[in-house]
Amino acid sequence: MPQLQCEEIRFPSADGVHTVAASMYTMPGVPVRAVLQLSHGMCEYVQRYRPMAQWYAQRGIALAGNDHLGHGGTANKGEHGHYGEPRGRYHLLNDLHTMNGIIHQKFPGVPVFLYGHSMGSFYARWYAETWPESISGAIFSGTAGPHIRNQAGWAVAALTAAVRGPKYVSKTLVKLNMGAYCNRIPDAVSPNAWISRDPEVVKAYDADALCTFPFTAATYREMLATLCHVSSRKWAQNIRKDLPVLLIAGTADPVGDYGAGVRKVWAMLGDAGVQDLSC
């Protein structure tokens, strides 16, 4: 069986400071009939998805994505967990658009489907609103729905960043945002036990320095501002009505409120008239 091929790509970030690290996975000898553009989650990076890329590439679906600002190979030393300088969320969004352009240039005429997971799904949802014609469909994986805690969390993060500084790491913010994630896991051996039912995946995550860093106050502010935006009815109404959208989530995933939040997003999009919608 041919080996999975990974092309590493670099391009300037929209922030004018960083160089974005990106990866593009294909299988030699297998024609590419579609591309899955990945928007990865919080505290991880694209190359964690190599097993998933292998599965798709064998079936003629390339997987390509960039490490977000503050993550993976895009973050400079000592900067992991921070993309919260002014307009940080906009830079992250624009980097996704640059990556999309690179994909279209590499595979002209091939449909591109945007796949956003967890935090990455918040930005994928915003992207689908902003540049709908650049994608053939969207998959929102492990996303979160509208909730009063989104606005409350943003307010606390914004205040903390203003008072303590944008790069301040607040244990209170970590607890408010993720402190309850293991509540339904009896005898959880790791604070990250919620990420997977497979203990080996949790062990690998815990051992990976590119995953085990905290977010700064300003990064929480930017992430939660994005979540608040894509939790609005206005966002849902702005989604292209004929855009195929698939929502998926683990039934034990706390980010999506154990499925309840995901169903709220599905209902919002349905109420807004999105026609090709699956959950």
Feature names for model-found ranges:
Residues 1-29:
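N-terminal cap/lid segment of alpha/beta-hydrolase-fold proteins
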Residues 266-279:
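Catalytic histidine neighborhood in serine/cysteine hydrolases
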Residues 247-249:
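Short beta-strand/loop motif that positions the catalytic acidic residue
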